[in-house]
């Protein structure tokens, strides 16, 4: 520790940090401490705090244990900063704030307020957090939320002020003075601008655009970046903390509340989003803000972080202007109006701009780009179909006592055959208290404990009853007819499962037997990979809901029902996004809703070459999603599209499937289902492929074809027969009726134009056999 008034050198300036995780489940090893580990990485990152982790500990949600650790780290270890994670909510055992209040000597309410304000900009549930920040001696204590995402965001909210706060506590006079001098040199914020004279909305927007450009030039000259009003945008403060590296804050679209931006379109230009809410240049970090500590001298970078939070003149930009000024995805605004130009129909593509991708490459790409989801702790009864994220160990022996394998008599093997007195009985669920002596036996039932003195069991079939009680209710004497050997028909302790044995390995896909095994070993809570949530929508102006009466030019939507049922058949939770018209604004709004609520979004229609097929443009222009492929060399399903979008470090998966009913179902089985299986942690998510014989001749197509078929087994034949479902036109949903397989037919060549009845082919299983 530095003495009072001591001038710290660069070496002395190293910040010593402790990370304290408060969690019952982590303490009992039922969950991994993701937030604590992540905070350690953030603290040590040289482009962030650049601190040293001097202490790390996990404690249960107990006030005394929390207090004891905090006091020890403050008074004995003399840490500069303590970050706690967990226990700040409303649950009965969330007591971290109470423990902190009993330890600190002075409060730091500004830091708690900064975290609350930042959290409320992210989610209204931020109001349920109860952080306490304060000082004990020369140690700063900060309460952070228990989730990895929440703790990282709150750490980022207070990060710009942390180095200066610690310098103040350590009396680092020179560094404190440098910061204060830098702040004194800052110009005062200008007064609020007068509202423009009342004109037409279009004129008002144009005036504001000019005004923004002038203000931007002034800011460039002064080197001071503006900050946006916290109530005007949902862009988190994490995006404003320009020195957070992309490796920690994943690039992605920031979600705006849909009422945040007012959008208008001028007659003279295409319908592009024009944001009229007050959006400042803080949305787009300037080079001044992006500067990292190792690229500047002294404390300039730290002062720059403080400058970015001072009030400045707000500016107004259209969404397209904001996006053009921002190169990173953190600052893309997802508004409710699309920037896709729908007016120039004559200039649309006549040939697809997307290259043809082979089926193998497309499938590999999907699996490579699809992440495995995080974990959660569930009750074992809810484990059907889930994948274990941790090994499961037995905490007891099974059986926990020597148990009888059969109904019969517990005997002493050394006594041999002969007549024996019966001293009682041992039943399952009871522990016998008597000891079998020479010349005695005890009647036992299957699964019952073996009494002391006995070392074998003779089944009832190998005995004769010699004597019974007068009323016939008791056996008094029995004759043993065989020679028993020691251990005969006895399951010793731990015979089935030994204490500490791994009974289920990480990655196990749980079924009924695994659920029963968990019950057997008494493990009622297990850590599993999360199920992906899947949102499904159909696109097309021609579509009606199934319950609607047909109208001229309309058809009923079958894709959504079929896709939802397919996903639900595999056990995944779904969200029905309904029917979306062929309009970029509607598509964008529906995609935004799906992105905010689900892990995977499935659309059908709007991906081919029609003049109303806008989906790929919305993904590219509005969402800035990465489209990995837009056409696949296969039949059916040529225009199948796969895209990903990273938001706040979370990857969203988007499958834009063809609109033809059969194409949608086939591509869902080929691409979507394996991706979902990978997301839930299944080690081999590939579909099941078997061999089958063709029941009829099949003509080949120039493209690899997935031909719908019904698999049946004939008596005493090892391979099933694959019967075609008939006409394979992609619009004919009847071809999917009763189909439980897809014939994987090769493309046509000069030598092979068809396959003949009886030939063996590969078949992908898509239904119950």
From Swiss-Prot:
Specify the signal sequence span. none
First-tier enzyme category under EC: transferase
Gene Ontology terms for molecular function: ATP binding; cytoskeletal protein binding; identical protein binding; metal ion binding; molybdopterin adenylyltransferase activity; molybdopterin molybdotransferase activity
Q: Which UniProt keywords apply?
A: ATP-binding, Cell membrane, Cell projection, Cytoplasm, Cytoskeleton, Lipoprotein, Magnesium, Membrane, Metal-binding, Molybdenum, Molybdenum cofactor biosynthesis, Multifunctional enzyme, Nucleotide-binding, Palmitate, Phosphoprotein, Postsynaptic cell membrane, Synapse, Transferase
SMART domains assigned to the protein according to its UniProt record, in alphabetical order: MoCF_biosynth (SM00852)
What pathway annotation does it carry? Cofactor biosynthesis; molybdopterin biosynthesis
Query: Which residue intervals make up region (MPT adenylyltransferase)?
Result: 327-769
Q: Report residue spans for region: Disordered.
A: 181-232, 260-299
**Lipidation sites of kind S-palmitoyl cysteine?**
212, 284
Question: How is the protein's activity regulated, according to its record?
Answer: Inhibited by copper and tungsten.
- Residue stretches of biased makeup (Polar residues): 261-286
Query: What EC number(s) does its UniProt record assign?
Result: 2.7.7.75, 2.10.1.1
CDD domains with a match to the protein in the record: MoeA (cd00887), MogA_MoaB (cd00886)
> Where are the compositionally biased (Pro residues) regions?
187-199
Compartments reported by the entry = Postsynaptic cell membrane; Cell membrane; Cytoplasm, Cytosol; Cytoplasm, Cytoskeleton
Positions of modified residues (Phosphoserine): 188, 194, 200, 262, 268, 270, 338
- What is one Gene Ontology biological process annotated in the Swiss-Prot or TrEMBL record? establishment of synaptic specificity at neuromuscular junction
Question: What family is it from?
Answer: In the N-terminal section; belongs to the MoaB/Mog family. In the C-terminal section; belongs to the MoeA family.
Indicate what this protein is called per its UniProt record: Gephyrin
Look up and give the organism this protein is from.
Mus musculus
| Gene name linked to the record | Gphn
